[in-house]
């Protein structure tokens, strides 16, 4: 491909000790080193060093000779023997570009993978003068909400900008006036000092220019991905693959064992369904609470006495490889890792101490204290540094912070109750010796999130003052309430609940009151359990910990080898952001995330180095980690946890194909199939083709011999024919909508071979039995022969000119409602 537009230069920014990098770098010593990576890639490394602080800035850029594209990553390293000043707002890209003074300026972008049927939905946003747009990761997973791939189009040209960061990225696009586009992108939160020898990096940025229409830009991107942005095990791009598992029938792998896995493989082959991979998903390891209890990464020898090797050997002997699921980053309680190496784990609530009752046996009611010198934000709750909060129980238990008077006299009581959850709605009280002196509400009865009380009371030695939180409107959820409580005694000493928290020989105790219409101090029962880190059931394996990282590499590598595993599948069913940020000090914000991301990418690079022919499958509750850095190392074989439903998956193929040439999903060939289940299910062509993708996983219950296997064999044979076209140029032929009274269609075209394929779907309530589809990428003067794989049989064998197919359109007739058509075309000669 020839160079069709000038390539941009890297542009990044940060503040260092309050000064702009754009002002600092010209003053620092710099050098440039250029080297050829291969015949198509030139690497340019520019380094600046501040001799005063020892901060080294290194920008590593790669320019491509076969595409008008550039990529870069920026690294910061402390080369001194002392901490650096603060680095903040470390942006991988901060740049602006001239654009025409026209309203014809559009951003093409896509939804991420929220698993709600809107996954990968394409969006077209007009960027008129002064438009400001913000995109980013959600919860620390990069494509939870937004895809991190963007195409700006104006006139007959445009620019693709892609952020590669498997964490919490953020991007802001601003049309400054009408003649400039400003772009700012990077890790969302950075404010840190670097320790001696420490290094961090930005997200990977890719900028690609294109000319023509925006779809041409998308296809230029697809070709770049295939050339430079996808894994190539054994030096080759992944080929379309048919996989199968028994997960629907056995609750993932909970009900699986050696015998039934071998039986399932044999049954597929018995029915003439040649598999590329046998897929063994979650639940194969030691656990006693179901598949989510991950953290003991050993094959359950009760069900698999010799591990997976007998299954792998059996499959290999019959030409079937094995895929096995892992989820190393999430660690559940009561597992080998959590019990033996808690120092390898991150809690989102590190430093948050919780007091609760073992008699109740539940997390709430409780009193919580943030021991940290910094605030903690988690799931919408904000704990100030060195602060107390409390929470009622699910059955109406009141939570109490109790003061016991050390001497007789007059006490000044001050209480401040603050809702610290976004949705706190509760009642609060102050009781003295069982009698109320203050009753109020948080965000109920017209009151706000904060109420205050000041009283003067008489207390004898040993008498009590209770600060109480209830469940307000009868719903205890979200009722985390901050408390500032102070009693100043007759001696002038101020007893502060937060400052004296947990100290011996002081006046404060913590407990709960039994449920009732009003608090009854006589029912006070002290909390008898202290949790130093109030973590939930899951922790995050810290891939930024070198010791933990080394153990994981060696352990997983051994599992792969010993069990004959051919394809490594990694899931990620947890939002890591609160774990990262909960472990950052105020002057180290962003460091935990950065080190985890670097460790994650290095972990995969090491596995790929040790297993050069092995493909990696990236899953994160479906497709929630499909950023470019991840996609360079893996493919998403399960693109969404929204499974099987035809219309949603039609739209997914439509949207994701704009950016990722290879992706996968599963099928039962039945639009009514539940996520889990077994038994005989019908084989519907419409459902099958709606879920067809470059990688296709079968979820049918192969134990059942009453399934229509002849029909399924034909569908799979035709799908394998279709598979050869997925790496062609992609053209959407209709708008993308989830309405059930429409058609949807797209085209994959191979210009090098002058052929292609069209897929079209008539949805259940579409009143039209025919649609005309104007094809793209054809030679007007050429003649094309039509061949039908599915539906629209009236077109089979016809020959049509490229001009007619492009200008008049290919007529597709479907009597079936719903129905699917798969139509090939190939050049046979001139008109």
Predicted regions located by residue number:
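Polysaccharide-binding surfaces and accessory modules of carbohydrate-active proteins
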Residues: 1-179, 188-190, 783-796
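C-terminal beta-strand-rich structural cap/linker in extracellular carbohydrate-active enzymes
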Residues: 798-831
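Short, acidic/polar linear motifs in exposed loop/turn regions
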Residues: 79-82, 421, 764, 779
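Short Pro-Gly-centered flexible turn/kink motifs
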Residues: 192-211, 818-825
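Gly-Asp-aromatic-enriched flexible segments
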Residues: 353-516
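Alpha-helix-loop-beta-strand connector modules within alpha/beta enzyme cores
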Residues: 308-315, 592-611
